Amino acid sequence: MPLTGRKIRVLVVDDSAFMRKVLKDIINSDPELEVCGEARDGIEAIEMVQKCRPDVVTLDVEMPRMNGLDALRVIMKKYPVPVIMISALTQEGAEATIKALEYGAIDFIPKPSSSISINMRELKDEIIAKIKEAAKVPRRFLELRRIRLLRVQKAKKVKPSVPARIAVAIAASTGGPQSLLKIFPKFPENLKAGILLVQHMPPGFTRSFAKRLDSVSKIDVKEAEEGDVVEEGKAYVAPGDYHMEVTLRGGKPVITLNKKPKMHGVRPAADPMMITAAQVFGRRTVGVVMTGMGRDGAQGIVEIKKRGGITIAQDEKTSIIFGMPKAAIETGMVDYVVPLEKIPETVVRAVEMIRGGGNLGRHVTIPR
């Protein structure tokens, strides 16, 4: 039972009666959750938010009369509540979902296009866990976010391809897309490191997210492919349903993708990426663990620190979900605990420290 002693109230919004029933059955099967109402479109959703005062809303992206994005804007502006988007596995669905996360949605659940009831029931544990985590999100994160991200006009000149000698390994989950979109524009074009990013997302969504990150960043961002050489000033996003690892090939750091068993219930997981990055780059590795639920990234932080690298965790105040950073900090192997807005400058300082041959002591906390 939640700390309040009452069940978590959930409003289910979907234009499909069948889909609403599947979601209601899943939610009501957990003793800590209850469905307080349902709606068929965005207009009904706004009315029901006022009537049943839910703790969490599950909101379909594509609906008649008023779609999920438009409803989300109104809900976050007038009746702030944690919202989880239910999105189709299409390019349009993925792009709309990324936009919804920018507007203030906490998380999303992919909606398979066929065998919906079978697939959604396979997702039962994930749906229940995400609803419970969303209900805990501090109110300060519940607002209509207008992230004014200007598309960056990248220089047309061809940049020289320089294999990275330093790696920045970033782990993120719930709350990650919104947070990463805030910090990636701050990385300088001439960053003397390659960035390896694992954001927990299913196939299709990672490609849309990589494109969105690229559009607002000075560095080049792409969804990672098998055999990519890790280069300076470039970021590589692990593709959905593949673990991303790093190996040495011909003296160059190369990305490999695999479908080894899920770790922490997810694929991609950050730990395989961070551990192999540490093995390849050694002390020239910077590890960053950001907002998200679970423990992914903690093992990677330990491995990076053991090999002399520099480790960073996002602080509790700016983490939408503090699970992953907390687990990393509890290893005792984190050098810097910093607010979200300080992560880019801390990474740049760490890269410069490594290039200059310096070494950070452990347990260093950058003050606000």
Curated annotation (Swiss-Prot):
Q: What is annotated as the active site?
A: S173, H200, D296
Q: Which domain of life is it from?
A: Archaea
Q: Which GO terms describe its molecular function?
A: phosphorelay response regulator activity; protein-glutamate methylesterase activity; protein-glutamine glutaminase activity
Q: What PROSITE patterns does UniProt report for this protein, alphabetically? A: CHEB, RESPONSE_REGULATORY
- What cellular-component terms does GO give this entry? cytoplasm
Major subcellular location class: cytoplasm
Q: Which residues form the CheB-type methylesterase domain?
A: 161-354
Per the entry, what this protein does is:
Involved in chemotaxis. Part of a chemotaxis signal transduction system that modulates chemotaxis in response to various stimuli. Catalyzes the demethylation of specific methylglutamate residues introduced into the chemoreceptors (methyl-accepting chemotaxis proteins or MCP) by CheR. Also mediates the irreversible deamidation of specific glutamine residues to glutamic acid.
Name the record gives this protein: Protein-glutamate methylesterase/protein-glutamine glutaminase
Origin species, per record, is Pyrococcus abyssi (strain GE5 / Orsay)
